[in-house]
């Protein structure tokens, strides 16, 4: 599946004009298909993502909801999907609170197979300078990606 469909018009400029705020690169000793499957798994709670479940069809134009303990924590919209290679979605912290007021941000996963290793690049853009989401993201992604790597390479997850 490689597609882009109707995107919320308010999000389209965000999608096309963002400069990256954070770029994380991690190499995972697993096939690209296994890494992709973990990223788009909508059936299981993700122990590697601090017990977060993602509810989504992962189809462009569709919604994505991150749930912790059965409660929506983050919502977004899938903007692009190219199976096994790329996924782009918006990321908006649920309100009320100061993080909610910071507006939507943009997350992009890019996967490349290199021999028996997958190079996963995560780019997070449109974060408010000095904002609380930016602060949380700066420490959150390294932990989440380390958890994904641990889970895929040895079956163990990290706990916070």
Language model regions located:
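Hydrophobic/aromatic beta-strand elements that line small-molecule binding cavities or substrate pockets
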Residues: 24-26, 75-80, 105-112
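Intrinsic-disorder/low-complexity, polar/charged segments enriched in Ser/Thr/Lys/Arg/Asp/Glu/Gln
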Residues: 19-25, 63, 73, 86, ...
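A conserved amphipathic terminal alpha-helix motif
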Residues: 2-8, 126-160
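Short, solvent-exposed secondary-structure boundary/capping segments
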Residues: 84-92
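Short beta-edge strand/loop motif at the mouth of beta-sheet-based domains
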Residues: 23-24, 43-77
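Short acidic N-proximal helix/loop "leader" segments that mark the beginning
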Residues: 1-23
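Short, solvent-exposed aromatic-acidic interface loops
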Residues: 92-96, 123-130
């Amino acid at each position: 599946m490689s597609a882009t469909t109707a995107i919320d018009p308010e999000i389209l400029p965000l999608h096309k004009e963002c400069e990256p705020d954070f770029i994380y690169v991690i190499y995972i000793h697993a096939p690209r298909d296994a890494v992709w499957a973990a990223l788009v798994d909508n059936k299981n709670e993700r122990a590697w993502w601090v017990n977060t479940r993602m509810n989504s069809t992962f189809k462009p134009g569709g919604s994505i909801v991150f749930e912790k303990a059965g409660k929506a924590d983050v919502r977004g919209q899938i903007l692009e999907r190219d199976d096994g290679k790329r996924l782009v979605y918006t990321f908006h912290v649920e309100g009320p609170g100061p993080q909610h007021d910071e507006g939507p941000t943009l997350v992009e996963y890019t996967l490349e197979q290199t021999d028996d290793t997958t190079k996963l690049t995560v780019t997070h853009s449109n974060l408010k300078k000095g904002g609380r989401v930016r602060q949380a993201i700066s420490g959150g992604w390294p932990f989440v990606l380390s958890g994904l790597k641990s889970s895929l390479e040895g079956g163990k997850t990290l706990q916070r």
